[in-house]
Amino acid sequence: MDKLVIEGGVPLTGSIEVSGSKNAALPILFAAILPEEPVTITNVPDLRDIHTTLNLLKVLGCDCQYENGQVRIVPGSLLPEAPYDLVRTMRASVLCLGPLLARIGQARVALPGGCAIGARPVDQHLKGLEQMGASFQLEEGYIIGRCRKLTGAHITFDMPTVGGTENLLMAAVLAEGKTVLENVALEPEVVDLANFLCACGARISGQGTSCIRIEGVTSLHQATYPVMPDRIEAGTFLAAAGITGGELLLHNCPYDELESVILKLRSMGMEITQQGSGVLARCCAAPLRGTDVKTQPYPGFPTDMQAQIMALMCLAQGASVVEESIFENRFMHVLELMRMGAQIKVSGHTAMVRGVQKLTGAPVMASDLRASASLVLAGLAAQGVTEVRRIYHLDRGYEHIEHKLNAVGARIRREKQ
C-alpha cells in the first residue's frame, strides 16, 4: 500500500492540464454496451476506476483497448453478470444495469462498493426501471433484473439522482416508445452522457434541464467522442493555488461548470479569471477570508468539493461554516485535519471551522476520495512533513496527482508503507 509524503510550505506556480472527467467517463464507458458497433472515447483519464470498468466490460463480453487516454470498445455477445470481485470497489458499476436490460433483457449485478460516505441507495434506479417493464429480486448480494422489452414511461424521481438519471437515460434510448424523465439531475456529467448517446444515434432532448425526453430507437451506431474535463479535479487545483498562496494556470478547465466553486473561492480572496481556453488562479488575500458553504445538487456547490474547501477554511481568517446536505458521514476528514492543528467542530450535518495561523505536518489517513484530496491540500500548506496514508482512494479519482503538483513546485513523493 502506498502513501504520499509531502513537504509543505511551497507556493505552487505554473500550469496544469486538467484531465478528462472520471464521473463523466464511467457512465459513458458503460453506455458503450448499447451500440452494436465499435465506439472510440477520447480524453479518458488513467485511473483505477477506469481500468476496473474496462475489466468489467471485458467480463460482460466487450473487447476493450486503452492507450494514451483513448478507449476503443468493440461489443461482443453480452453476458449478464457483473461479479462482486469487480463491483465491490466501485459504486458506479451499478450503471451497467440499465444498458444490460436494454440490450439483452437480463442483468445480475452485485451490490456496489466504493467510498464509505454513507448510504447511497439504488432504489430510484430500480423503481424507474420497473416502470419501464423490468422486474428485480435480491439474491445473495446480487440485484437480478429481467425484462422482455423495456418500454417508454413517464418517470418522476423522488429527488434528483445522478446515477439514477444516467441509468434510466441509458435504458430509455433503446426502449420501445417515448420516455419522459422528470426531476432529473442537472450535473454536467449527465449532459455529457446524453451528448455521447446522441452522437451514437439516440434521440434525446432536454439534457441540462429538469426534464429529459427520450424517443427510443432500435439500435445505436459507432461514434468517436471526447469526455468533458474534470470539474472536481480542476476545482481541487484552484484550491491548491489558494491554500499555498501560489498562481496556477489550468488548461482545459471547465470554467462555466465551476461557477459555484469559483464564486466561493473569490469570496475567500482568490482572483480567478479566464485566460483563453484556460483559467488563471492566484491568491490575492493573505490570509484567506472565511466563508460559508452549503453543498447542493448542481448548479449549487458540489459535495465533491466540500472537503477541499474545508482545507482552505482551516487557514482562513475568522470562522467558516460547512453544511453537508447531500451525503451523511462526509466529515471523516475532519479528525485528520484536526491532527494537523485545525480547529473544527462538527454538529450533525454542519462543521464549524475557525481558522488558525498554521497547520503542522502529521501522519494522516484518507477515508475516501475527496477526503484524500483535502489532506493533500492541507499537507501542501502545512509546516513540516505530512504523510497521507491509504491513498488508493486518491488513485481512484486523480490522474497522476503527485506528478502534476510536483511540476508546479510541490514536494511530494510516493512511498510504500
UniProtKB/Swiss-Prot annotation:
It is found in: Cytoplasm. This is UDP-N-acetylglucosamine 1-carboxyvinyltransferase. It catalyses: phosphoenolpyruvate + UDP-N-acetyl-alpha-D-glucosamine = UDP-N-acetyl-3-O-(1-carboxyvinyl)-alpha-D-glucosamine + phosphate. The modification 2-(S-cysteinyl)pyruvic acid O-phosphothioketal is found at C115. Pathway: Cell wall biogenesis; peptidoglycan biosynthesis. Its EC number is 2.5.1.7. Keywords: Cell cycle, Cell division, Cell shape, Cell wall biogenesis/degradation, Cytoplasm, Peptidoglycan synthesis, Pyruvate, Transferase. Phosphoenolpyruvate binds at K22, N23. Cell wall formation. Adds enolpyruvyl to UDP-N-acetylglucosamine. It comes from the Bacteria. GO terms for cellular component: cytoplasm. Belongs to the EPSP synthase family. MurA subfamily. It comes from Desulfovibrio desulfuricans (strain ATCC 27774 / DSM 6949 / MB). GO terms for biological process: cell division; cell wall organization; peptidoglycan biosynthetic process; regulation of cell shape; UDP-N-acetylgalactosamine biosynthetic process. The gene is murA. Pfam families: EPSP_synthase (PF00275). UDP-N-acetyl-alpha-D-glucosamine binds at R91, R120, P121, V122, D123, Q124, D304, I326. The active site is at C115 (proton donor). One of its GO terms (molecular function) is UDP-N-acetylglucosamine 1-carboxyvinyltransferase activity.
